[in-house]
Every structure is written in C-alpha cells, then in structure tokens.
Regions:
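Charge-rich, low-complexity N-terminal segments
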Residues: 2-210
Length: 210
C-alpha cells in the first residue's frame, strides 16, 4: 500500500487515518511548574494576564495548548512565561512546538490575526536569564541529523552557547533571546521539513549549583 504522508502514516487502521491539514497551523502544548507554595495563583494569574486573542487556547488538568499562526503561538507562550516569572521563584516550563502532524485537523485554531503579537509590549520590557534544554525531531526526511546540526549553528550564531547533554542540547541566555531562537528554529523547520516537533524545557532561578 502506498504511503502518502510524510511519515508513512496513512494506513487506514490507524487512529488518525483520514486526518491531516494543509492550513498554516502551528501549536505548542506546555505545562508550567512554579516551585513555590503559591503555585496556584502564579499559574492562574499568568494565564489570566496573557492575551490569547491571537490563538486558540485550551487548558486541562495536565497542560495548556495554543494553536494558530507561529508568531502568535510563540507570542502567547513567551507572554505567559514572562507573566509567571518572579525574581525569587524557581520555575520551569516544559513544552513542545509542532507543525505538520499527520494526525492534525483543521479545527481548534485561529488563523486570522494580523499585526504585532498582543503580548509584544509585555515581552519587550522583560529581561532575565533562562536556562533551556531542547530536542528537535525533524520528521519525514532522511537527512534529519543535518537539520539538527543547522539549528545548533543557529544557537551559536545567536550567542546562546549551545552544549551537548545526553539526549538534548542545552542553551542559555536572556528570555527574549531564547524565545527568539525557539521561534527561529520553528520557522526554519516549517520551511524545510513536512513535520517537526521541538521539545523544550525552560528554567529560571534554579537552586542547583553548577
């Protein structure tokens, strides 16, 4: 049987058979972890402060997902992280950006927004150091390792000091520089591969001595 998707996932007995979208939908699913006794108001307060008018959003007991055009998805995730940041609270955000999944659908998205991201002003005033580890999965291409090397060099060019750790790459820098890099990686992937997943973890104010 001919496989007509980027990952060879077109078998009719699979749960996502018949799905897929040609729309310009990117998404990020993430969970926020403030290591503080007031974690509930930190999480809910950040969700409330963040302007999600440019994306489709949904939260459940495990995570939050934003879906829409890539610049606005990144704007919403960065806005939430900035809104949740507190100078003395250790906090992590774990998530994944993705586009091109053969199991995706046309629904649950917002693609009509134009102009600057609604959280741009909030983001512009934020500056604090962030540690990040990431793992990139370019799907549906045989030269995936070359694509991973490309984004490594992008991190070098951005001054984020990439280093290899087991099963991931680690970078560090100002919050805006880190999110600009994640955005650039996603943009590069959507232009060069049919499907990608970028898994990342952000950490601030870690008590771990290095």
């Amino acid at each position: 049987m001919e496989n007509n998707t980027c990952c060879g996932c077109s078998q009719p007995d699979l749960p996502w058979a018949g799905r897929g979208t040609n729309l310009d939908i990117s998404g990020c699913r993430f969970s926020l972890y403030p290591m503080d006794s007031n974690f509930v108001p930190i999480i809910l307060g950040a969700l409330e402060k963040t302007d999600t008018s440019a994306v489709w959003s949904h939260s459940d007991a495990l995570s939050t997902v934003y879906r829409g055009r890539l610049p606005y998805v990144v704007d919403a995730v960065e806005g939430l992280f900035v809104n949740a940041w507190q100078p003395t609270v250790h906090m992590a955000l774990e998530g994944q950006f993705s586009k091109g999944c053969p199991g995706d659908t046309d629904g649950d998205s917002l693609l009509t927004r134009e102009g600057p991201g609604p959280n741009a002003q909030t983001i512009a005033g934020a500056h604090f150091p962030v540690l990040c580890k990431l793992a990139l999965y370019p799907m549906g291409v045989s030269d995936y390792i070359d694509r991973i090397a490309e984004v490594w060099h992008m991190a070098e060019d951005a001054g984020l000091s990439p280093t290899s750790v087991h099963y991931a790459t680690r970078i560090s820098g100002d919050v805006q520089a880190v999110f600009d890099y994640l955005h650039a990686v996603c943009r590069h992937m959507e232009q060069t591969v049919p499907h990608y997943i970028l898994h990342f973890t952000l950490s601030v104010n870690s008590p771990t001595a290095e």
